[in-house]
A protein has these predicted regions:
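Glycine-rich beta-alpha loop elements in corrinoid/cobalamin-binding modules
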Residues: 1-101
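Radical SAM [4Fe-4S] cluster-binding motif and immediate context
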Residues: 108-295
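Short, surface-exposed connector motifs at secondary-structure boundaries
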Residues: 1, 24-26, 47-49, 190-194, ...
């Protein structure tokens, strides 16, 4: 059983789930991964998990399953995991493969998910839906990592030589791959709402503009739950109206607005000096987004 823990806020809930599963199904193998889990791996292992992935786990999970199917629990050959052996935490810190070409990743198996149940429950993004609204939605990523390295963010620490390796490096799927995934979601699964989970959708602004232009004809609603960096919505400190209008035309209805701080010193010291508070027309930016019916 695998349980992801991405944010600190999820930690208590995930560890409680682990406790309940171990109580009722002690023979089950419990895995965890994600940002929160990998940086707090020892606590997760002491809390009942058998294995924690300490980097991206697209290949790791397959290797674990291959060993488990043989009836073994010898994880010693699998890189970038921590696990429990005879009551002790073992750290397999040898480096594994960091996937730089995201088109190498297998096509997401959305068809294996009980999507109709997700649509009824409306979680984990249910807070962005109307109270009585049932939306046929799915999540996807067009990129991994981020071009910035802010001190408060895990990405700034996920560099070459770190425990997870350089998975914070900004990497993208090709335009063709992104459009193939979107068309599949709409045409094969009937999805109408897509949550973009990228840490930095506009990390390459020209690429993002190309994608938005292609998405227009799909007639989908788009939301970016992690936010779009303010600097990418600006041109010389003013609202980039071309981009904002294109977002609306492509179907963007909602996204998080990551101001990060209202203090210029904090932005410069801890937030990669991404934008200049004193020379940015934030009020104009907000008005431009609202004018285009984009909720923040």
């Amino acid at each position: 059983i695998g349980i992801t823990s991405i944010f600190s806020l999820q930690e208590t809930m995930v560890l409680h789930c682990c406790e309940l599963i171990k109580k009722h199904y002690p023979e089950k193998l419990l895995l965890s991964g994600g940002v929160n889990a990998r940086w707090r791996a020892d606590k997760f292992l002491n809390g009942g998990f058998d294995i924690v992935a300490t980097s991206e786990a697209e290949d790791t999970i397959k290797e674990i399953v291959q060993v488990y199917r043989k009836g073994s629990r010898d994880w010693s050959t699998i890189p970038q995991i921590k696990y429990i052996k005879e009551g002790k935490i073992i750290n397999n810190s040898q480096q594994g493969k960091v996937i730089m070409n995201l088109d190498e990743l297998p096509f997401p198996a959305w068809d294996l998910l009980p999507l109709d149940r997700y649509w009824k429950v409306r979680r984990g993004h249910g807070v962005m839906f109307g109270e009585e609204e049932e939306v046929k939605y799915a999540s996807m990523m067009t990129s991994l990592g981020c071009p910035f390295a802010c001190s408060y963010c895990h990405i700034g620490k996920e560099i070459k030589g770190s425990l997870p390796q350089e998975i914070g490096r900004f990497r993208i799927k090709s335009d063709e791959r992104v459009m193939e995934e979107l068309r599949y979601l709409k045409n094969e699964l009937g999805v109408k709402q897509v949550f973009i989970e990228d840490d930095s959708l506009f990390g390459r602004k020209k690429r993002a503009i190309r994608l938005l232009k292609q998405v227009i004809d799909l007639d989908l609603r788009l939301m970016d739950i992690n936010g779009i960096n303010i600097v990418h919505l600006l041109k010389k400190g003013k609202p980039d109206l071309e981009v904002i209008e294109l977002m609306a035309e492509a179907g963007f209805t909602d996204f998080s607005f990551p101001f990060e701080s209202g203090n210029d010193r904090i932005i410069k010291k801890w937030c990669s000096s991404k934008w200049d508070i004193n020379n940015t027309d934030i009020e104009g930016l907000i008005k431009a987004l609202k004018k285009n019916n984009i909720r923040m």
